[in-house]
């Protein structure tokens, strides 16, 4: 039996250019996600000069601006960050679903790796837990995912 050919990415941000696209809504959570993402890039060899932060109003604005960023060819990867917290109306379900679908479509259309770090939680406490306390930092997790995807795609290409 022959040996398997395994292609894996590695967490090396050196020489890579990133856009961190983040919503302003629920900024007390999103700002922590941004900090986690920046810290992750720097810990893995990236530089501040290769990080561009773009802010938009809310989650519904993320897909279009993500597409525009993808089409510039200025970025090796884009990290999408936001926090959608359930309220008492079905608005949460529509926003969470459409924002997610929109960002996935951008990635498939433009071939730019996207790390999706948009929290969808039932409570503010759950969001805070996922932005750097008990449940880690999902901004950092999304950044690791995009780093790995970039390096896997480089090996495949």
Swiss-Prot record:
- GO MF annotation: an example: 6,7-dimethyl-8-ribityllumazine synthase activity
Q: Does the keyword Transferase apply?
A: yes
Query: Which residues does the record give as 5-amino-6-(D-ribitylamino)uracil binding sites?
Result: 25, 59-61, 83-85, 116
Q: Which GO terms describe its cellular component?
A: cytosol; riboflavin synthase complex
Claim: Magnesium is one of the keywords in the record = no
The family database entries (Pfam families) matched by this protein are listed as: DMRL_synthase
User: Could you say which EC number(s) this protein's record lists?
Assistant: 2.5.1.78
The record lists the catalysed reaction(s) as: (2S)-2-hydroxy-3-oxobutyl phosphate + 5-amino-6-(D-ribitylamino)uracil = 6,7-dimethyl-8-(1-D-ribityl)lumazine + phosphate + 2 H2O + H(+)
Question: Known SUPFAM superfamilies for this protein?
Answer: Lumazine synthase
Q: Where are the transmembrane segments?
A: none
Q: Which UniProt keywords apply?
A: Riboflavin biosynthesis, Transferase
**GO terms of biological process kind:** riboflavin biosynthetic process
Active site, renumbered: 91
Q: Which family does it belong to?
A: Belongs to the DMRL synthase family.
Q: Which NCBIfam families match?
A: lumazine-synth, PRK00061.1-4
Record-given protein name: 6,7-dimethyl-8-ribityllumazine synthase
């Amino acid at each position: 039996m022959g040996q398997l050919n395994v292609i894996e990415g590695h967490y090396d941000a050196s020489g890579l250019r990133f856009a961190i696209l983040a919503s302003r809504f629920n900024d007390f959570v999103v700002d922590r996600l941004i900090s986690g993402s920046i810290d992750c890039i720097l810990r893995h060899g990236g530089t501040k000069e290769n990080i561009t932060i773009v802010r938009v109003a809310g989650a519904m604005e993320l897909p279009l601006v993500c597409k525009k960023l993808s089409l510039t060819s200025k970025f090796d990867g884009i990290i999408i960050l936001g926090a959608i917290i359930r309220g008492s109306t079905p608005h949460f379900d529509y926003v969470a679903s459409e924002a997610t679908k929109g960002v996935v479509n951008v990635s498939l259309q433009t071939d730019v790796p996207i790390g999706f770090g948009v929290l969808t939680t039932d409570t503010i406490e759950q969001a805070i837990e996922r932005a750097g306390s008990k449940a880690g930092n999902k901004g950092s997790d999304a950044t690791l995912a995009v780093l790995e995807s970039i390096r896997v795609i480089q090996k495949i290409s």
